[in-house]
C-alpha cells in the first residue's frame, strides 16, 4: 500500500482559477488544465492566483481582490467536485512582494491553510532586501516557497 502522501503528485503553483489573472480565462480552460494535470498523475492542486502584497496596506482593496478570487474559485470548486471527485482542490495565493514589508497575517494568503506561502518578485528580479524579508517571514512562523 502506498502512503497517502506519496500517492500521486501535488501541484503547489497553478493559475486555474478562471478569469482572475494571466492563467485560465474561462471555466472551460480551467477544466482542460485540470484534465492535463490529472492525466499527469496529479492528485492534489493548490490554486495560486496572483496577489499583490501592496494590497495588504488597503483593507478595502484587499477584500475586493479576495472576493473576486473567492467567486471564481467557488465556480472552479463546484465544477471540480462534480466532474473530478477524486481530485483534492485547495486554495492559496502567489504573493507578489511588490513592497518590502507586507502584512501577511491573513491566512487566506497561505497555501491550503498551512504556514507555507508562495512568493515572487516584480520583474522576476530578486531585490537586495530579499534575505532580510524572508528571514522575517521565517521568524514569524511562515515557510516561504519561491515561485
Q: Could you tell me what each predicted segment is?
A:
Residues 1-82:
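An N-terminally biased module of ancient metal coordination in phosphate/nucleic-acid-related enzymes
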Residues 57-147:
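Extended substrate/RNA-proximal surfaces in nucleic-acid metabolism proteins
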Amino acid at each position: 500500500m502506498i502512503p497517502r502522501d506519496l500517492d500521486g503528485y501535488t501541484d503547489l503553483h497553478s493559475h486555474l482559477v478562471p478569469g482572475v489573472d494571466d492563467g485560465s480565462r474561462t471555466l472551460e480552460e480551467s477544466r482542460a488544465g485540470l484534465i492535463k494535470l490529472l492525466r499527469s498523475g496529479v492528485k492534489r492542486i493548490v490554486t495560486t492566483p496572483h496577489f499583490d502584497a501592496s494590497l495588504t496596506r488597503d483593507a478595502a482593496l484587499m477584500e475586493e481582490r479576495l472576493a473576486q478570487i473567492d467567486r471564481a474559485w467557488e465556480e472552479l470548486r463546484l465544477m471540480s467536485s462534480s466532474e473530478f471527485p477524486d481530485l483534492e482542490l485547495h486554495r492559496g495565493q502567489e504573493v507578489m512582494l511588490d513592497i518590502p514589508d507586507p502584512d501577511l497575517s491573513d491566512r487566506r494568503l497561505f497555501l491550503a491553510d498551512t504556514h507555507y506561502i508562495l512568493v515572487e518578485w516584480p520583474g522576476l528580479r530578486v531585490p537586495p532586501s530579499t534575505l532580510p524579508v524572508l528571514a522575517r517571514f521565517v521568524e514569524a512562523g511562515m515557510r516561504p516557497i519561491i515561485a
